[in-house]
Regions:
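Gly/Pro-rich cap/lid or specificity-loop segments adjacent to the active site
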Residues: 5-187
Length: 187
């Protein structure tokens, strides 16, 4: 059973980047426990950026799911080269999500874990930072942007998250691209 908490993204900042690229940063509050098993209604913040070029379409979105786990999304000023530039040139808006626990999203640190108490309490908290929860966060972001479906690009651990997305919410995906270090085995 998935959580019914309604999530609305809050616009935090707008930044012009070289080459006519714009970066808009948002935050969205999502349930700590999307599946209603525990968490007592706690929420975490997920931060994301939407990069758009001069000719980006209003309905073509690419969600980048970075490797790790534990790394924030790429810096938006890298948008003028590499794969981000290629996606923008193909008129996609690129969504860079700081997965829960990383970057500008609600962080996980030694200090925050110690404050939770013993190891079982820490494990109970950390189980909400797996791929299935990241997929649900992405779904909340997609819905808040009013996007029917999008393309995902999963790099390394992000590829694992993309495959999890494909298995749990295939109707939300236009296509899935995987790169680097993904081992897919039968469950």
């Amino acid at each position: 059973m998935e959580s019914t908490m309604e999530s609305t993204a809050t616009h935090v900042s707008h930044e012009a980047i070289s080459g006519g690229i714009c970066s808009d940063r948002y935050e969205i509050e999502v349930p700590l426990d999307h599946f209603g098993n525990d968490g007592a209604g706690e929420a975490v913040k997920v931060s994301f950026r939407v990069l758009a070029g001069k000719s980006s379409s209003q309905d073509k979105y690419l969600l980048f799911l970075q490797g790790g786990p534990g790394f924030g999304s790429p810096a938006p000023w890298t948008a003028s080269s590499g794969w981000i530039k290629a996606a923008l040139d193909k008129k996609y808006r690129v969504v860079l999500m700081d997965q829960r626990g990383t970057g500008l999203s609600t962080p996980i640190s030694c200090r925050s874990l110690e404050a939770m108490g013993d190891a079982p309490a820490q494990v109970a908290y950390l189980k909400h930072f797996r791929a299935d929860s990241i997929v649900q966060d992405a779904e909340r972001i997609r819905e808040s942007l009013g996007v029917r479906s999008w393309l995902t690009l999963g790099q390394s651990f992000g590829g694992f998250v993309s495959v999890t997305y494909l298995l749990t919410s295939p109707g939300s995906l236009e296509a899935v691209l995987l790169t680097g270090g993904v081992c897919i085995r039968a469950c």
